[in-house]
């Protein structure tokens, strides 16, 4: 992976590199490969992730169809 450093601006180059790595999923993969994961645990994790994705997709679909209220967007500067 390459990032150009312009005008000796290393901070900006590091920020761009981190963004690229985040998009590629490298940090997540490093976290997962940090220790051995048994095949049964891997299957269980992948199944749980698939269920989570399906549930999220169904929720978004219901919101688009108007069956669920849209989540209100937080106002800037307020908690």
UniProtKB/Swiss-Prot annotation:
Keyword Ribonucleoprotein attached: yes
Biological process according to GO: translation
Molecular function per GO: structural constituent of ribosome
Highest taxon in the source lineage: Bacteria
Gene Ontology annotations for the cellular component aspect, listed alphabetically: ribonucleoprotein complex; ribosome
Region described as Disordered: spans on this chain: 58-79
Protein name: Small ribosomal subunit protein bS21
Organism the protein comes from: Beijerinckia indica subsp. indica (strain ATCC 9039 / DSM 1715 / NCIMB 8712)
